[in-house]
Amino acid sequence: MMMRSTGRCAFCRPRAARARGAALITALLVTTLAAVLVSGLLWRQQVEIRRVENQREAAQARWVSRGVFDWARLILRTQADALPVTYLGGAWSVPIAPTRLSDFLGKIGIARAEQGASTWLSGGVVDAQSRFNLRNLVNSKPATGLQVNPQAQMQFQKLLSLLGLSSDLAPPAAQYVLTTLLSSVTKGQQAQTGDVASDALAAAQSDGDAVSRESGLTNTPGMSAGDVATQMTRPIQLHDVDDLVAVPGFTPAVIARLRPFVTILPVPTQINLNTAGPEVIAAALPALSLTAAQAMITTRDQAFFINLGDAQTRLARFMTTGETLDGQFFDVTTHYFEIHARITHERAVVDRVALVYRDPRTHSTRIIRVQDARQ
């Protein structure tokens, strides 16, 4: 009996050990799996928390940028109230070095100014009319409607040549601006091009769209029949210099070279002779060389132009021909400005640019558009 019992226990002992080992391994696997799942959930939660924090900090930075825009607008209005001339020596032209927000709040007596210690701001104001406005390439006349401005196109050709670029890029750029303006007419309006056939075709298309709207049946809610027909071929309207990449011949390298000297504003504008660089001034005056423009700017830095007559008198010293300054292209004040703001709040960094219009009569300002600055 003892021999038989001993043999049976010896046989059961390995099975019990194997069962305990399997249970231990299973427990370890379950524990490991649970730890992995929990760590994954915690990691996802941490990522979500960080994402929400980043969104909150970015939103706060954007709110600070709005304050910077309002502050700059106040400076622009104050400057216009004091002097009807826009020149580079004004308070508006002084850039803001990286400064803590708390420093500004403390100076004006804001309570709890120390809360802005983690927020830094910098930026400046740029005279948008110190550059060549590509919108000048197209003008509008009651008799002919929208058409390419040949004088502005020649100015752009000279600017391209002064910058070491091909002047052949000017005609396609002018044509592209014209095409985008003609295609950006809103619903219910017709582009008066001056061509009877074109206007009749536009009127017929408008009537067809009206019939489609009256039927109430459409596969594209919110879009007219004309929109559906042209949405794939309609060029994108220019709002930024980088949009020139859609024009044949304008490579990123060409655009990078052009960027400091050109801009795109909602309407044709004059060049401010008090703020424009020598390349822009020389391009706008066919008989003026780049060297002469640089010499003229040297005298301008000593005393700004008070009006076009003053600029004409001083310009005559640097020109061999009796070319006059056309008020269509030149002025000594500015109505459009770009406000650049860079806000650093905690981990968030926001770069924004606002285009501001200043009324020449009331000096009131309003923001035309705000966009993120392109790096």
What are these regions (language model features)?
Residues 3-12, 22-32, 36-375:
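Compositionally biased linear targeting/interaction segments
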Residues 17-20:
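Sec/Tat signal peptide C-region and signal peptidase I cleavage site
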